[in-house]
Amino acid sequence: MKRTNKIKGTLERPRLSVFRSNCHIYAQVIDDSSGMTIVSTSTLDKDVKSLLNNTSTCEASKIVGQVIAKKTLARNIKQVIFDRGKRVYHGRISALAEAARESGLEF
């Protein structure tokens, strides 16, 4: 399925961009109007990696979702726009999104 519109975030409602590779998952909150990354985390971060046995599971994605939500809420940002990239909203992508929602982010 091809998306024709590009997703853009603002300072009030930045973009939560998710990238999934075969081994890791990355999440970052981006303000597209200034081109700045506000917060980011991945399964490569020391605090996240220490909690995991395997970085390519849905459980790892849930932990990344919880961590990105905590970091974003610490910056007083409650609403984001979810950007899954070209990936289908399934598996590790949906696990990260649901964990971020349960931790308090709104999208």
UniProtKB/Swiss-Prot annotation:
InterPro entries: Ribosomal_uL18_bac-type, Ribosomal_uL18_bac/euk. The keyword ATP-binding does not apply. Pfam families: Ribosomal_L18p (PF00861). SUPFAM superfamilies: Translational machinery components. It is found in: Plastid, Chloroplast. GO terms for molecular function: 5S rRNA binding; structural constituent of ribosome. Its main location: plastid. Part of the 50S ribosomal subunit; contacts the 5S rRNA. This is Large ribosomal subunit protein uL18c. It comes from Guillardia theta.
